């Protein structure tokens, strides 16, 4: 069966079992039951509680909750074993660490819920774009109905300003133009017609933007009027297909999520293995299989679990991302999904829509031929666009460009019309591609005719040359067409204007009577100009190893011209159309996309295919756009970038990031910020894991030697207080000098890539050695002669614990200074991180407070230490800086080789 746009109006009406007068009310009610209301499906709403539970699926949080549960259980069991009367303080002290862990879990979950993207907002935004009311023919009469009541077979009346309520076939047309940019990406409104369309040779389908006898839900009538018979409603419309594609596109994890999930799994296996080993080792070594002995051994294992898990990591990552989001929003990049920030940092391809993204979405006259003032005034008068009170042109975009052209030359449309009022016209018709207006001037009449250069020139018998009317010769005709071709080669849309003078008002206003024996005045070439800042932004993208790609619904010539101007491509061989794309299989497409930088005349499904092909090439892909047509591909991309000003609500709600200023250059800033944030998160991760490594090795080694280095609550304090503040401060480091001159990182690189794993291990060992040394010195101060034997016998030393706690805290505080750069010497960094200095001082004061405030010292089980011990701890801890600086020096030397 022939497609609707290939059928005549009679065939379409017959196929839908309707007439040009519309359906009867009774028949419409039957069809409403059959097809359902003309609206888009609503997405399933996710409750706040369900969103909260989804946050708790994070592996890191699961490990923390298990650790909290085990700690709580052992504390309660241990408390129940105490003789009566039991000391409630023992229970409270044991549950402190449980409470701290649960607060961390709760905080992360709440932050996740607040930041989480609301998927159903996309469908709701699509619904708001559909017309609320529409004019429908029912029982042969025009009635106003809610758009949801429309059914296939209904005949709707469309006028300028109306939103098209459903997909339809045009059956009556009076110079109607429909703006379809949101669906097709083409900025110029489409001149509609009623004739059936035919396929050209080798064509299997007519692209959406070329179906001139069709109209689609979500588009807007900008000129003329007409009637259309509804062919599809609701989810069967083109808009509905987009909504359905959005619903079917599955969410993928960002690289950071994958890395943190991987880290969570590694830590869970590590914790399980170490805990089982220590539990078994202690039981066998001590030979104490009583409940008390088992619980004591179990608490040692819990200590190791607490030591192994960086409790502050999830919070630090979330807060660093949140701070980055705030900073980006101040630069007009609004992040809608928290973990998507770092995805920008490894973006390798940016697929960008043209209209409104790379260009201004504002047709502008950029070149003219002939007397510029006369051409401008004539074209402004021969148009239906007008200037509002703010001198902004309103109307069809092409005519707005002509009115603005005259205005820039000092000729306002209203002033021109006051001097030469319009008295008659022959409206534009897509068949003849012209329009004419007749104006009264000084007791006579002048007619202006504008349209396509070929059709206007064919009706000219003379031309204006140096203010004189001279006969049109073949030589002059060739000159005019050469000027037209020169403009067209630049992808300009060219219009011609001519005039005819009358001593009396023409008796006939038919085109056949008016549009002959014309005097050619000139040409005007217009284009949707590029945004002035985009070219520099694209150069910066290339410098950062990112490939920009243009994907548009516009014509190939226009797209190529814009892309060449911006530096996206070098020649037309790097451009391909949607029709040509259809001939390439999904299997071959990933290889083909590498060849092209411009995709023209594409439809929504093409955009999704292109983005998917780049992803199959293992390239982290971003997609920018503003129209509804961009929404599925934006959601398919690793990171979708919507436009805040010109963007539709559906695009903004699907996007991971929205550019508040619609500025392509903001993407470059966002990419740099994404790289900075990821670099800083790696610094924080390295710092926290090195700290945890030192705790694990210290507790593990001390257990093997027969004494307790630190208790779980001590480790939690270090992890959540001493470490967290410097880690957060590291997340606020300024970008390093090479941030935007190095290639994007490989998204497959693990969290320990680039030598981070080695750094964590050696730095963890370094802090362990320093901490154990401090513990042993403290124990020797407590036990005096033969201190090691006494320590083994006692199994612990309050003095040693105090020294270990102080030294480990100081060591990690000083180590945070090292972490300002993974490879560069911190003494060569030009920027100053004042927040880090404050964090280091704050952590040091809090650590000292625990040791010096009596009730805290008692609660933590510490002994009072003097200035000598403080001096020893400081001397030991500060050695971490020169040692790490020396290793960095060696690493830089190796890297150069």
Region locations from a protein language model:
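Conserved cytosolic headpiece of P-type ATPases
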Residues: 1-744, 749-752, 765, 805, ...
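Membrane-helix interface motif
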Residues: 79-80, 772-787, 852-857
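Core segments of transmembrane alpha-helices
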Residues: 694-695, 759-771
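Helix-coil boundary and interhelical linker segments in multi-pass alpha-helical membrane proteins
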Residues: 703-711, 777-799
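Generic alpha-helical transmembrane segments
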Residues: 722, 799-816
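Membrane-water interface at loop-to-transmembrane-helix junctions
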Residues: 746-765, 791-803
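A C-terminal functional module that forms or caps the active site or interfaces directly
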Residues: 819
């Amino acid at each position: 069966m022939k497609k609707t746009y290939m059928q005549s109006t009679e065939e379409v009406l017959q196929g839908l079992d309707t007439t040009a007068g519309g359906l009867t009310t009774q028949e419409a009610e039957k069809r409403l039951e059959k097809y359902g209301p003309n609206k888009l499906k609503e997405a399933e709403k996710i409750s706040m509680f369900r969103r909260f539970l989804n946050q708790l699926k994070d592996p890191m949080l699961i490990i923390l909750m298990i650790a909290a549960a085990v700690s709580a259980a052992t504390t309660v069991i241990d408390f129940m074993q105490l003789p009566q009367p039991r000391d409630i303080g023992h229970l409270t002290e044991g549950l402190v660490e449980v409470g701290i862990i649960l607060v961390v879990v709760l905080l992360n979950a709440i932050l996740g819920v607040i930041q989480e993207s609301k998927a159903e907002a996309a469908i709701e935004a699509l619904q708001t774009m559909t017309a609320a009311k529409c004019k429908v023919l029912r029982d042969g009469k025009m009635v106003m109905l809610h758009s949801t009541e429309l059914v296939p077979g209904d005949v709707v009346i469309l006028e300028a300003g109306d939103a098209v309520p459903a997909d339809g076939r045009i059956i009556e047309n009076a110079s109607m133009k429909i703006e379809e940019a949101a669906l097709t990406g083409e900025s110029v409104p489409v001149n509609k017609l009623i004739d059936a369309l035919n396929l050209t040779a080798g064509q299997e389908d007519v692209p959406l933007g070329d179906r001139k006898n069709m109209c689609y839900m979500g588009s807007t009538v900008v000129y003329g009027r007409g009637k259309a018979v509804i062919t599809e409603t609701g989810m069967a419309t083109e808009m509905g297909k987009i909504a359905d594609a959005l619903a079917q596109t599955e969410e993928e994890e960002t690289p950071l999520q994958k890395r943190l999930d991987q880290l969570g799994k590694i830590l869970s296996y590590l914790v399980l293995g170490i805990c089982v080993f220590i539990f078994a080792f202690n039981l066998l070594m001590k030979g104490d299989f009583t409940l008390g002995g088992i619980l004591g051994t179990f608490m040692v294992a819990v200590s190791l679990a607490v030591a192994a898990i960086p409790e502050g990591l999830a919070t630090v990552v979330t807060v660093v991302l949140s701070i980055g989001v705030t900073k980006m929003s101040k630069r007009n990049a609004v992040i809608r999904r928290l973990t998507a920030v770092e995805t920008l940092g490894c973006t390798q391809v940016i697929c960008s829509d043209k209209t409104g993204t790379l260009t201004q979405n504002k047709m502008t006259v950029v070149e003219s031929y002939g007397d510029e003032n006369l051409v401008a005034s004539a074209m402004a008068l021969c148009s239906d666009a007008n200037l509002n009170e703010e001198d902004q042109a309103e109307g069809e975009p092409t005519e707005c460009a002509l009115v603005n052209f005259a205005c820039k030359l000092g000729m306002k449309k209203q002033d021109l019309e006051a001097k030469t009022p319009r008295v008659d016209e022959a409206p534009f018709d897509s068949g003849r591609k012209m329009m004419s207006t007749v104006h009264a001037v000084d007791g006579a009449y002048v007619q202006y005719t504008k349209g396509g250069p070929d059709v206007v020139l064919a009706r000219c018998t003379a031309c204006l040359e140096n203010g004189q009317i001279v006969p049109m010769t073949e030589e002059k005709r060739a000159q005019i067409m050469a000027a037209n071709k020169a403009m067209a080669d630049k992808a300009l849309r060219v219009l011609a204007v001519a005039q005819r003078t009358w001593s009396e008002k023409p008796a006939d206003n038919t085109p056949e009577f008016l549009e002959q024996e014309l005097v050619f005045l000139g040409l005007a070439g217009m284009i949707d100009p590029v945004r002035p800042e985009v070219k520099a932004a694209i150069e910066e993208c290339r410098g950062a190893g990112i490939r920009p790609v243009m994907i548009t619904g516009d014509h190939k010539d226009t797209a190529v011209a814009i892309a060449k101007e911006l530096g996206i491509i070098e020649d037309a061989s790097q451009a391909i159309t949607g029709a040509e794309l259809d001939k390439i299989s999904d299997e071959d497409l990933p290889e083909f996309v590498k060849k092209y930088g411009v995709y023209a005349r594409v439809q929504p499904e093409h955009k999704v295919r292109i983005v998917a092909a780049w992803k199959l090439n293992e390239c982290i892909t971003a997609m920018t756009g503003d129209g509804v047509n961009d929404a599925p591909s934006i959601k398919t991309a690793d990171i979708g970038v919507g436009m805040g000003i010109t963007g539709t609500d559906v695009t903004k709600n699907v996007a991971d990031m929205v550019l508040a200023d619609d500025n392509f250059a903001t993407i470059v800033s966002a990419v740099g910020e994404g790289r900075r944030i990821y670099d800083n998160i790696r610094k924080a991760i390295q710092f926290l894991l090195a700290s945890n490594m030192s705790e694990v090795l210290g507790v593990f080694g001390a257990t093997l030697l027969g004494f307790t280095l630190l208790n779980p609550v001590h480790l939690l304090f270090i992890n959540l207080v001493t470490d967290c503040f410097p880690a957060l401060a590291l997340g606020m480091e300024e970008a390093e000098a090479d941030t935007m001159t190095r290639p994007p990182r490989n998204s497959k690189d693990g969290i320990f890539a680039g030598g981070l794993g080695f750094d964590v291990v050696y730095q963890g060992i370094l802090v362990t050695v320093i901490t154990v040394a401090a513990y042993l010195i403290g124990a020797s101060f407590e036990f005096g002669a033969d201190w090691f034997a006494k320590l083994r016998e006692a199994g612990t030393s309050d003095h040693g614990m105090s020294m270990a706690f102080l030294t480990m805290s100081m060591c990690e505080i000083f180590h945070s200074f090292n972490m300002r750069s993974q490879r560069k010497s911190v003494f060569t960094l030009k920027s100053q991180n004042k927040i880090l200095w404050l964090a280091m001082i704050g952590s040091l004061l809090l650590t000292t407070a625990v040791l010096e405030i009596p009730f805290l010292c008692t609660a933590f089980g510490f002994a009072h230490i003097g200035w000598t011990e403080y001096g020893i701890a400081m001397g030991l801890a500060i050695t971490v800086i020169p040692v790490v600086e020396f290793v960095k020096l060696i690493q830089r030397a190796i890297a150069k080789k």
